[in-house]
Amino acid sequence: MLSKSITKLVQYAMETGLVPECEKNYTINLLLDVFHEDEYVEPEESFSDVDLEETLNELLDEAVKRGLIEDSVVYRDLFDTRLMNCLMPRPAQVQKEFWDKYQNSPQEATDYFYKLSQDSNYIRRYRVKKDQKWKVDSPYGEIDITINLSKPEKDPKAIAAAKNAKASSYPKCLLCPENEGYAGRVNHPARQNHRIIPITINDTPWGFQYSPYVYYNEHCIVFNSKHTPMKIERNTFIKLFDFVKLFPHYFLGSNADLPIVGGSILSHDHFQGGHYTFAMAKAPIEKHVTIPGFEDVEAGIVKWPLSVLRIRHKDSARLVDLATHVLEVWRGYTDEAAFVFAETDGEPHNTITPIARKAGDMFELDLTLRNNITTEENPLGVYHPHAEYHHIKKENIGLIEVMGLAVLPARLKEELELLEEYILEGKDIASNEKIEKHAAWAAEFLPKYKDINKENVHEILQKEVGIVFTHVLEDAGVYKCTPEGREAFMRFIESL
């Protein structure tokens, strides 16, 4: 049985181009060694179009049977990554192949690297497929909703083991270059099948990789080779454009550098990008503005729920200068009438979420104004999802959400399924503790629909989730899309 599964895995590796034909025996022997097995019997049957998930599961079941691993998702993931390592080209080979293809075209290089990152099972296609995705019309264009199901839930045993595991500071975090080839442990994922492309931006060494959870097409992460904290500054804008010049078909953005309005990792300087056009990028300019000293730069307020100033020019250096000016003014800007405070008790509140892209021969930079002030009414943040929407989304509004893609928690899958059932059967939503948090929301939207049935209930809920997410984005906007809000936005622009 083991020989057969190993044969299938090696066949998969040859079909996908991970392993050349001449390395077949070598790869079989590496896999035998992982299983502490001396014997191999070539199966009589031949295999093609091998299903990776199924083959890995056969090998994992065998490893459990042999007492090599515990039967839980955390240990299985650590072990199957070790198996995939036997099929992987070395980092130097991947880098050479990437830059060889790059000479032909940047897109050919990224196509190769993205396919490799999936074939290697670093991006687990069969898990990503489970994510629920849909689009919803909004006053700001078509926004994307996803319920992220590709991160496996840890089982209680593994959680307990992680608690008792001795603390390690190697690698310092999930974004450090030392992850490449790391075997992992119960509280840190295995990364032997992970490859990084070294790049230079702003004359400093950075790494380019894909996100294992691909929230959107070719979702990449670009990270500083040093473990250094996030900081939005002049150099940030230079780095964003250096990357976009290297890969003009990709956008690149940065999370803000303050808690609440930032991303989940503030400790390691990094950006996120990819090959995808978000609703925000499609959103038009609703009001053109001219900024003194930068009359040659196209600028305007974007029709978007968050407060975005878009600037465009053929010369990225002009955009870097203007963005730096906007950032410096915004960091120190207070407008009490609009409830914008640069700082309270010495704590700074204003920052920016920037996104860079190339459109034709123009460089474009979207500067999203952020503020992380908290009050007694809104202890998690004034410009953050308000409590009435926490049943759908209470996490930070980071870069990906800012651009118009909701990344919603896995719990919603089951909750929305239950909600459908309760709505169709006319049951009391508040009576079920799993979904009682949705009762007020349902009571609000149900009267809008005359006839809710089995055919349309799913679509109705998807649409209503989209409406809630749109409100969440409006909450995160410092200047609201109202005449008063736009007036206050213009006061800031005039201060430039």
Predicted segments, located by residue:
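Helical scaffold of the NTase/Pol beta-like nucleotidyltransferase catalytic core
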Residues: 193-195, 225-252
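Hydrophobic faces of well-ordered beta-strands that scaffold small-molecule active sites
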Residues: 208, 252, 269-271
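Amphipathic alpha-helical segments that form well-ordered structural scaffolds
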Residues: 239-243, 325, 468
